[in-house]
Amino acid sequence: MIDRRNRLVLASLEDDAGMRCVDIYRTRDGSVLWDEWRRDPEDPSGWHATGRLSGAVFPDESSARNAAALEIEWLET
């Protein structure tokens, strides 16, 4: 499970349809990471984790964004 409380979102990048999103975020210990989220139009409860997330820690937002773009097919840098 992803802990959404202990992070500062640096960027939230949505697809054109607004149904998928990648968050680039910094944790309390300074780690920069990314994870992918989705929402379903028939489910009003909001965003849900897809389970796709960074396998490494990045030094900055730009590095995390570039790494996410290599993994997430709809994401463009």
Which stretches of residues belong to each language-model region?
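Mixed-charge, Lys/Arg-enriched low-complexity segments
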Residues: 1-2, 42-77
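Intrinsically disordered, low-complexity regions of eukaryotic proteins
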Residues: 5, 17-18, 25, 37-38, ...
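Negatively charged, low-complexity tracts enriched in Asp/Glu with abundant Ser/Thr
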Residues: 1-19
